[in-house]
């Protein structure tokens, strides 16, 4: 199957099955989204949504969090992964926002990447979800599903390479949704250790499943 046809059929499926898709993180502002995304690294959205309400009740914006110390923030995020490092990142990020952007989260990629604790994946989520830009964040779910569905090649062995490969074929209008489509498919169907192939409606297009069946 040609690469273009594979993309067309897979994207058509996702458009039909998930027409109104969005992040599962809960937030009330762009700053709160940024905090939630930073916290979500190596952690589930469910866990993040459990800790952010109390965190945001004390630190609803960059200016209030910038006045805190990492140990203050740590009290509210102890149950997430790497809490000490994340508390440090959050306070430094908030202070940088206040110093450089009057407490507002910028939409520019380079300005986002200059913030403490913000990498390309996080910056892409902010650009896409908060500002509606054509940006595709590649997390572990997106990376795994893209490879299993044959959307990218084995040579695309870094998140950046996967991002570039995906955005080469995905129509610009679909790019923001494509992140959520692939992520949610990876989170609930094409899971890491025991993928639910029996209920996957894309199994006819899955080279990974075909390869596994030949080895059986």
What are these regions (language model features)?
Residues 2-215:
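Catalytic cores of DNA base-excision repair glycosylases
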């Amino acid at each position: 199957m040609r690469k273009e046809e594979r993309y067309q059929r897979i994207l058509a499926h996702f458009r039909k099955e998930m027409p109104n898709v969005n992040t599962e993180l809960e937030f009330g502002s762009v700053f709160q989204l940024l905090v939630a995304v930073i916290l979500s690294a190596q952690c589930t959205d469910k866990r993040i949504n459990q800790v952010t309400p109390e965190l945001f009740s004390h630190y609803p914006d960059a200016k209030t969090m910038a006045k805190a110390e990492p140990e203050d923030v740590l009290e509210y995020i102890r149950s997430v992964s790497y809490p000490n490092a994340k508390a440090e990142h959050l306070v430094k990020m908030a202070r940088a926002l206040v110093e450089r952007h009057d407490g507002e989260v910028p939409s520019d990629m380079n300005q986002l990447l200059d913030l403490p604790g913000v990498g390309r994946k996080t910056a892409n989520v902010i650009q896409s979800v908060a500002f509606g830009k054509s940006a595709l964040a590649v997390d572990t779910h997106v990376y795994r599903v893209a490879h299993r569905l044959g959307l990218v090649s084995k040579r695309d062995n870094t998140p950046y390479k996967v991002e570039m490969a995906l955005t080469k074929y995905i129509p610009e209008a679909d790019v923001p949704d494509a992140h959520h489509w692939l992520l949610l498919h990876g989170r609930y169907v094409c899971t890491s250790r025991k993928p639910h192939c029996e209920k996957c409606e894309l199994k006819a297009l899955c080279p990974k499943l075909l390869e596994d069946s030949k080895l059986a």
